[in-house]
Amino acid sequence: MLSGRRLDLLDPSPFDVEIEDIAHGLARVARWNGQTIGKHIFSVAQHTLLVDAIARRQTGGIDERLALAILLHDAPEFVIGDMITPFKAVIGDSYKIVEQRLQGAIHLRFGLPPTLPDDVRRIVKAADSGAAFLEATRLAGFAIDEALGFFGPRPALPEAVERDFLTPWPAETAEERFLAQFVALTKR
């Protein structure tokens, strides 16, 4: 990692996790295997901020711990990449085990339980699916009917929010905005 930490992917320690490494990595990992429109990739860091905006809209507001869980919901991808769902299914449990271990270490590092409660996971999943719908139809060339079948209904967001979050940012912008959201949530 750029911080100098060495993270054991098979036995990750919360002590080897730094938010700067997560932000840097996620800002450079492409969603949709990079198959999106725009001058820049649509990064996992930008995706997590879109998921946050959707969750806030869907729930009428969320507390800081839930918002932190949302921000970090794809954090393991800073070191293992964003593998597309069909390929995850082919690889099976081995990938899930590594991902869950990393997620647990990341959560512990930032004061969250290793495994999120079911109600929190449902909120994250609903907002994540909504983000996938918007990304698929606005950035990745999916037809609306096709996206409905995969991701469920389109979430309601103000046009200005959609325009901001669905215009791929440069990696530096995604990293800065991800870190700014982390600081706002943790008061660090």
Language-model segments: which ranges?
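Metal-dependent phosphohydrolase cores
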Residues: 1-188
